[in-house]
Amino acid sequence: MGKKYNINQTTHKILALFTTDYQRAIHLREIARNIQTDKKAVGIHLNRLENLNVLQSTQKGRNKEYRLNLGNPVTRHYLILAETYTTITYLEDNFIIKKLTGEIADKIDGAIILFGSYAKGEAKEDSDIDLLVITEKDIDRKIIIDTARIMGKEINIKTTTPKHLQNGIKENDPLIKEITQNHVVLKGVDCLVESMWRYHGER
């Protein structure tokens, strides 16, 4: 009999807790509190993810701590699913960023990551939109200028290459650290996951 890959909303929410730090260890009670779900239900999903070798656990006193199984290449694909789930739920609740994504996603070659106040859910009426673009190519700044004018918003854009992103993660660069801890991937989820996976998988 094959394993059952029953991936639902709760599974995505659990895995999303690990997308900011692939080395994170977290116990059941904290997971349940973070995703606002009953501990018993969370425990069922954690057991399933552990049986699938996506998570692994260690006993710390009376608590069981869970962390990503970075030795399983399939875990990377679960992280991509978790990031995608986060993006979908975020865009459905944030019309401005959803509109922005529609305006620029097909015009910019590379991954696009939202960070700053909008990614943290702290944006105000006059907040700027902060974007990181991961690309090997130059960006046509006119696209950003035109989009900012259409939306009536200031758009701050920073660029980096996949290699520089990986170096930034490795060197604990303050900006890259901020982005990995609070982000929404608007395009190119696999690019961010790959960069973080390479670093954390080699530690």
Regions found by a protein language model. Give the residues of each.
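Short beta-strand->loop micro-motif that forms the acidic, two-metal-ion catalytic signature
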Residues: L131-V133
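Catalytic core of pol beta-like nucleotidyltransferases
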Residues: M1-I108, K120-D126, T135-R203
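Short helix-loop-helix/strand-helix junction enriched in hydrophobic and basic residues
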Residues: G110-Y118
